[in-house]
């Protein structure tokens, strides 16, 4: 499994075309539940360019891009505590899976 991080949107992208394995949706739902980020399929126009997409296609293993924070990049450091709290559960759960 791979977790990649970007800074924009408070959303988790989990799918790449039809390559993600069956358990990917269930794991993504768990990540969404512990973070309160929405779980969404990767928009077509955003596909084909990310490490997550390459990983899913080549290894047929779950992969997730987690978009943290809101606003104009670079995000202000004042968002750090919220981003940390929102993502701690994902990191712990990801390590246990």
Task: Show which residues each predicted segment covers.
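Metallocarboxypeptidase
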Residues: 1-97
């Amino acid at each position: 499994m791979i977790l990649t991080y970007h800074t924009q949107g408070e959303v988790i992208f989990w799918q790449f075309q039809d390559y993600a394995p069956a358990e990917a949706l269930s794991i993504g739902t768990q990540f969404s539940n512990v973070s309160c980020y929405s779980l969404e399929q990767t928009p077509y126009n955003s596909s084909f360019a990310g490490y997550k997409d390459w990983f899913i296609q080549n290894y047929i293993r779950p992969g997730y891009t987690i978009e943290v924070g809101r606003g104009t990049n670079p995000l202000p450091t004042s968002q750090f505590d919220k981003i940390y709290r929102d993502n701690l559960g994902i990191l712990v759960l990801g390590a246990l899976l």
